[in-house]
A protein has these predicted regions:
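Adenosine-cofactor binding site in Rossmann-like domains, unifying the SAM/SAH pocket
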Residues: 31-56
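NAD(P)H-binding glycine-rich loop region in Rossmannoid oxidoreductase-like domains
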Residues: 50-90, 99-102, 119
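Conserved cofactor-binding/catalytic machinery of classical short-chain dehydrogenase/reductase
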Residues: 49, 64, 88-92, 107, ...
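N-terminal Rossmann NAD(P)H-binding glycine-rich loop of SDR-like oxidoreductase domains
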Residues: 4-30
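NAD(P)-dependent short-chain dehydrogenase/reductase
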Residues: 120-129, 151-214
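Active-site helix of classical SDR
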Residues: 141, 145-148
């Protein structure tokens, strides 16, 4: 079957999470396209509030949605804010995906994460490895929320015929990343640690692996 690419030209496009690394990159890219670009600040609408999200969708009628909004962080953040990572990310994903369906969005792309795969999944990772084993404990709440989002996309596509898809970026870094010493992702954290070590002339660098510090 030949797949027909979705044409964004002339569409109203909503980037959820436009201030994050992925979302801001999408905004920069879409700025060069013939689209009506919609973004939404946290102060305007709490994406964890289903009623507020539904009202915004009904008023703005986005035709395409890039769902890059999420509460994210590194090992320390995932370990210490487990309830927040689960609740916030579940609410964001379920609210936006359902609102997109209710308001007949033509296309939605949900950004997953490589942490959805089992800790001991065979390498290289395969898509069908999801839900075949235990998750990495340090980011299990975040991973569970992402899995729910992926499954919502699958089920809304199969039951309602929604043109919703998921993509799985892995170890992203770049412009707009978070380089906080405790709450950043692995690549950004390593860049900061090695940069600071070189600047200070340090002989050793402390790095984290499954929640334990190594020198």
């Amino acid at each position: 079957m030949t797949r027909i690419p979705f044409e964004l030209k002339g569409k109203t496009v909503f980037v959820a999470g436009h201030r994050g690394m992925v979302g801001s990159a999408l905004v920069r890219r879409l700025a060069a396209e013939d689209v009506e670009l919609l973004t939404l600040a946290r102060s305007e609408v709490d994406l964890r509030d289903q009623a507020a999200v539904n009202r915004w969708f009904a008023a703005n009628r986005p035709q395409a949605v890039f769902l890059a909004a999420a509460k994210v962080g590194g090992i320390v953040a995932n370990n210490t804010l487990r309830a927040e990572f689960l609740y916030d990310n579940l609410a964001i994903a379920t609210n936006l995906i359902h609102a997109a369906h209710v308001n007949t969005c033509e296309k939605l792309m949900f950004f997953g994460s490589s942490c959805i795969y089992p800790k001991l999944a065979p390498q290289p990772l395969r898509e069908d490895s999801m839900l075949t084993g235990a998750l990495e404990p340090t980011n299990e709440p975040y991973a569970i929320a992402k899995i729910v989002g992926i499954k919502m996309v699958e089920t809304y596509r199969s039951q309602y015929g929604c043109d919703f898809i998921s993509v799985m970026p892995t170890n992203l870094y770049g412009r707009g990343d978070n380089y906080h010493p405790e709450y950043s992702h692995v690549v950004a954290a390593l860049i900061r640690r090695f940069h600071e070590a070189k600047a200070l002339g340090a002989r050793n660098v402390v790095v984290w692996e499954i929640g334990r510090a190594h020198v």
